[in-house]
Amino acid sequence: YRTTPSRDNIPKDDDWNETLVKETADLIGDILSEIKDLGLLSVSFLEALPIRTEDFPDDSMFYPIVESVRNTLIKEELLPADDGSFVSAGNAKLARGADLRKLLGQVQLGQLFQSTATIKWLAGEITQDRTPDLRSYLISELDVEEVTPDGLARRISHSFLSVQPDEWFVDFYGYLSGQEAL
């Protein structure tokens, strides 16, 4: 990038800088899959991406990069899932607590959300306490739903319960016993 003489800033109205921003946006959209293939795409890597949207308003010089990252994460299976695989934002759910991830496996998530697509829990290390910026980004920018105990209670239906095995009900009642608010 071309900088100011003191090298403390990057002029926004410079044609070369505008071209470089566009090229960087294209590159980051393309390279994320390769980073995944190399085994380097992790929760900590996602935290290094431009996910603090308040730092990049719509008129920011670097907004095209932010937009490219967002669009790529929405479309492609690049978010670390709890089972060690990856999932796109549209097929991802955040669990409020490890017990919820343990209670509902992939098949049950699909049944609960009445989806024919494979829905997966995001990696358990993505939490309000450990990764607040990433969690907020996933929810507000990528529209990933956070499933809470209350949300589970509202979503459970007769059709969902009728297809669950007896062993699951033992786990379910054990889970409910730890949820005083329900």
Specify the residue positions occupied by each region the protein language model found.
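GHKL/Bergerat-fold ATPase module
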Residues: Y1-L182
